[in-house]
């Protein structure tokens, strides 16, 4: 299972997203193998956003080991860290 995080590092949401990522790492024990952070405007980030229909940033996508879509959240209201962790750790 992997969590993809798509955001613009120089946006007004950057600090909030980075704090959220830190919360996932510390409180929810999400490690680097389960987390991929992408710049929304990079080639890879843009392709990933298109693949999973993420049109607003920040975007969070939980995918299976095969890359299959499981759950996503997007926009300025972040999901609860516990909810993200439950999807990431239970599949």
For each of these PLM feature ranges, what is it?
Residues 49:
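Short beta-strand-centered segments that line the small-molecule binding cleft or hinge
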Residues 11, 43, 68:
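Surface-exposed, flexible loop/turn segments at secondary-structure boundaries
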Residues 30-31, 54:
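Short, well-ordered coil loops that connect the C-terminus of an alpha-helix to the N-terminus
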Residues 52-62:
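Structural micro-motif
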Residues 62-91:
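Non-catalytic, surface beta->alpha helical segment in thiol-disulfide oxidoreductase systems
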Residues 42-46, 78-81:
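A short acidic, often aromatic-flanked loop/helix-cap motif at beta-alpha or helix-coil junctions
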Residues 1-30:
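Local sequence-structure signature of Cys/Sec-based thiol-disulfide redox active-site neighborhoods
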């Amino acid at each position: 299972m992997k969590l993809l995080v798509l955001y613009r590092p120089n946006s007004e949401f950057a600090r909030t997203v980075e704090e959220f990522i830190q919360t996932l790492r510390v409180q929810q024990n999400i490690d680097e193998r389960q987390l991929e952070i992408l710049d929304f405007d990079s080639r890879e980030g843009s392709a990933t956003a298109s693949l999973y229909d993420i049109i607003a940033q920040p975007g969070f996508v939980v995918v299976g080991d095969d890359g299959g879509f499981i759950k996503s959240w997007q926009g300025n209201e972040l999901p609860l860290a516990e909810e993200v962790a439950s999807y990431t750790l239970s599949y």
